[in-house]
């Protein structure tokens, strides 16, 4: 590919030993990545093989903006896999990525924070793969469509627990029954999200809960969805804005018999999901409760 050709002139000028001095024993040289997503500094980077994901995300990328929690990194483009935050010390080379369930692929690297739903993002990448299938292989053509339908059902609150095992079974069938690399790697986003984030799948199915509050079939208002008490936060705020504190208090009492206690112990997770925060600052819900 183009990246290989770009290395040829440097190798001819400086020699193979110079190029092999970078990287690991089995993965020599450097690699270009497109670093994007929830990271302070995005852009094209060139790093030696064997550098860790942590070094890329924090030393080069500057970390996660807004003091958010890192959830994982997806490598290899739409056909790659997801690597959780617990594996950020993983060396970036062909062997280590393959062992973790991902690929080097096209050099894409997407950083994801706590506001990313791993079920939804697996659905997103699989929708691309399914649309790109040429249709020659039956398992790729029909298998990815069946997997996409299952993921859409889960994201819309219609999933079943047995769907998780069915996704794993279909993933292996698509990999084994496809002739080209697209079908062979298409299930990677699904396989790795189930491998590392299975609890999110189970939350979607059992509790109809999306912890990132992004799946439209499960979430009406992100602030209410993330509230441990399930309070109708927008209605509560509207009553306060209209000068009706008694009615606002009644909204809390619909879920909690002791609203004063709620005001004292609430750690206001709704503020982290407040859509107003995307414009300027989140509404200070805890201060409103104090009022």
Protein language model features and the residues they cover:
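Short cysteine clusters
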Residues: 134-140, 180, 210, 215, ...
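Redox cofactor-anchoring modules in respiratory/redox and cofactor-processing assemblies
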Residues: 1-215
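Glycine/serine-rich phosphate-binding loop and adjoining beta1-alpha1 elements at the start
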Residues: 225, 229-234, 238-291
């Amino acid at each position: 590919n183009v990246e290989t050709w770009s290395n040829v002139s440097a190798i001819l000028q400086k020699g193979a030993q110079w190029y092999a001095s970078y990287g690991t024993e089995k993965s020599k040289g450097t690699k270009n990545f497109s670093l994007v997503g929830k990271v302070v500094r995005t852009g094209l980077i060139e790093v030696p093989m064997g550098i860790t994901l942590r070094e890329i995300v924090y030393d080069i990328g500057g970390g996660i903006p807004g003091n958010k929690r890192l959830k994982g990194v997806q490598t290899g483009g739409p056909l790659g896999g997801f690597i959780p935050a617990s594996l950020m010390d993983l060396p970036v080379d062909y062997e280590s990525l393959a062992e973790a369930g991902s690929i080097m692929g096209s050099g894409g690297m997407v950083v994801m924070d706590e506001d990313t739903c791993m079920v939804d993002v697996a659905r997103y990448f699989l929708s691309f793969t399914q649309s790109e299938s040429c249709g020659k292989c039956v398992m790729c053509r029909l298998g990815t469509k069946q997997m996409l339908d299952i993921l859409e059902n889960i994201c819309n609150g219609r999933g079943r627990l047995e769907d998780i095992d069915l996704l794993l079974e279909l993933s292996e069938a698509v990999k084994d029954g496809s002739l080209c690399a697209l079908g062979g790697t298409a299930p990677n986003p699904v396989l790795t999200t189930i491998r590392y984030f299975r609890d999110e799948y189970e939350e979607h199915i059992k509790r109809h809960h999306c912890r990132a509050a992004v799946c439209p079939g499960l979430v009406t208002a992100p602030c209410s969805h993330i509230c441990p008490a399930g309070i109708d936060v927008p209605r509560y705020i509207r009553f306060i804005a209209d000068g009706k504190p008694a009615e606002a208090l009644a909204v809390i009492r619909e879920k909690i018999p002791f609203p004063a206690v709620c005001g004292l112990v609430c750690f206001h997770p709704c503020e982290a999901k407040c859509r107003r925060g995307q414009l300027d600052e989140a509404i200070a819900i805890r201060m409103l409760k104090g009022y």
